[in-house]
């Protein structure tokens, strides 16, 4: 969400999940060492077939190379564009020194298209400070706004969100959103919300 620059993204916080698969079976998803992953592939079930399929595809060097080439750079913190298949390549058994394989990293961004989440255990973070300040610089051009993002990100922000003219115009005549525009001055091309 909006505070992911401080706390990370959901896929990094999934400890375990209880999910309903397409055949009606229930699967427990949690971190698996390479040997536990292998045991999952030997199960005669849809869950076993899922792990077999993942192993078959991601063990293929050409596929892994293509994923690493075509997917967004992992250094880009918020790169939520589709399924995070590339994150699985950094886990055991695909990387010997990788963290335990957790299919939850993939399921977290799938919006229910791969399995229905019944229960989820997340790693919690400390609460944010009691008081916060929001700075909202206004810009005459989208380019100026975008050029300020990298310099402001060196500061320990909790939130850095851009709103461009398109979004701002959508709120202008919306009765529900009009009152939320109290901080917008004039007709900026863009603004940054910095907490």
Where are these regions (language model features)?
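FAD-binding subdomain of flavoenzyme oxidoreductases
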Residues: 1-143
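Terminal amphipathic helices with adjacent charged low-complexity linkers/tails
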Residues: 37, 120-125, 146, 153-195
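Active-site-proximal helix/loop capping residues that flank conserved catalytic or ligand/cofactor
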Residues: 83-86, 150, 192
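Short, intrinsically disordered, mixed-charge
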Residues: 108-109, 150-154
